[in-house]
């Protein structure tokens, strides 16, 4: 009751407060009508479990012995797996043919192929990033390129 008298003294009454509350709620309702219910950007939220269960990057090791093994190497690249290829058990002419085939596959996928050792190559699909060079460690003799 004392607050009512004080409110009237300052020109505020309970009726005015109710009117202000009604105006406030109608303004909020109008603003909420503009936004769809699914307007929250869910791309910014990442589940911790999804990061743990996501597919892991894989590296496959191959020692081809015949030219037809190149198809298996290419299939792994198409499945977004990096491939380390050791040609030490092949003739140089067959190894060159496989390197040419894999180079074409890697080019088509926008990946990379690098020589990482004597008769050893690394072929990666586009989602892999390789840093650094070990060309100083590779012998200067060029058997396959």
UniProtKB/Swiss-Prot annotation:
Main localization, broad class: cytoplasm
Name of the molecule in the record: Cell division protein SepF
Species for this entry: Lactobacillus acidophilus (strain ATCC 700396 / NCK56 / N2 / NCFM)
Top-level lineage group: Bacteria
Keywords, alphabetical: Cell cycle, Cell division, Cytoplasm, Septation
Biological process terms in GO annotation: division septum assembly; FtsZ-dependent cytokinesis
Family: Belongs to the SepF family.
InterPro entries xrefs: Cell_div_SepF, Cell_div_SepF/SepF-rel, SepF-like_sf
Oligomer status and interactors: Homodimer. Interacts with FtsZ.
Compartment annotation: Cytoplasm
GO cellular component, one term: cytoplasm
PANTHER family cross-referenced by the UniProt entry: CELL DIVISION PROTEIN SEPF (PTHR35798:SF1)
Function, as annotated: Cell division protein that is part of the divisome complex and is recruited early to the Z-ring. Probably stimulates Z-ring formation, perhaps through the cross-linking of FtsZ protofilaments. Its function overlaps with FtsA.
